[in-house]
């Protein structure tokens, strides 16, 4: 059974990667602008003063304009840094320098605060390949965010950022997979 779920996840991830790859630039730009508006709305609605997010890659729903807005508003933004042991360190982002980690993921160059720094935020924005209508999140397969969220004693609201067609009825899941409290898509905010 675990192999069957793993195969289902692999197939779905491949399909989603291909869909993202062939999305026309003008569609992506419009989606990113709408996502930024909705992330700002969510942050304002929750009165967030400190959040954890991630720097989106070119094929992901865009978070960079939102992060720039948050920094400009004086909201503390922590960004992840992947570690070889499967955990995430966190570092504050000031909108300036960034580099790339060993997995090709963008990361801030500021002081590394360690894995428990995320416990100080009041909102967490995570990437996802897909999320189902019960809030089950399927990531890209490395398990970093599942480990982080699963280890938090008092987890603040967690929202995944996805494209509209990535909110589905069900996603294949395993015991370690973590649910999110909602999603932000180009069409809006959906809470579960």
Model-found features: residue ranges?
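N-terminal active-site beta-alpha-beta segment that forms phosphate/nucleotide-binding
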Residues: 1-120
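Short, charged low-complexity linear motifs
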Residues: 35, 126-131
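Short glycine-rich anion-binding loops that position phosphate/pyrophosphate groups of nucleotides
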Residues: 57-59, 129-133
């Amino acid at each position: 059974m675990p192999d069957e779920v793993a195969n289902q996840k692999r197939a779905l991830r491949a399909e989603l990667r291909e869909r993202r790859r062939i999305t026309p630039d003008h569609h992506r730009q419009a989606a990113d602008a709408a996502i930024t508006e909705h992330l700002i709305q969510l942050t304002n609605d929750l009165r967030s003063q400190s959040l954890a997010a991630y720097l989106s890659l070119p094929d992901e729903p865009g978070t960079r304009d939102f992060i720039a807005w948050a920094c400009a508003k004086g909201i503390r933004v922590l960004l992840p840094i992947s570690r070889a042991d499967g955990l995430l360190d966190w570092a504050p982002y000031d909108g300036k320098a960034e580099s790339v980690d060993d997995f090709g993921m963008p990361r801030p160059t500021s002081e590394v605060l360690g894995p428990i720094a995320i416990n100080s935020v009041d909102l967490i924005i995570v990437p996802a390949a897909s999320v189902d209508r019960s809030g089950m999140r399927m990531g890209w397969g490395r398990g970093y965010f599942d480990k982080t969220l699963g280890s938090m004693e008092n987890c603040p609201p967690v929202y995944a950022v996805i494209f509209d067609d990535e909110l589905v009825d069900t996603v294949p899941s395993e015991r370690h997979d973590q649910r999110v409290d909602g999603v932000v898509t180009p069409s809006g905010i959906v809470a579960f």
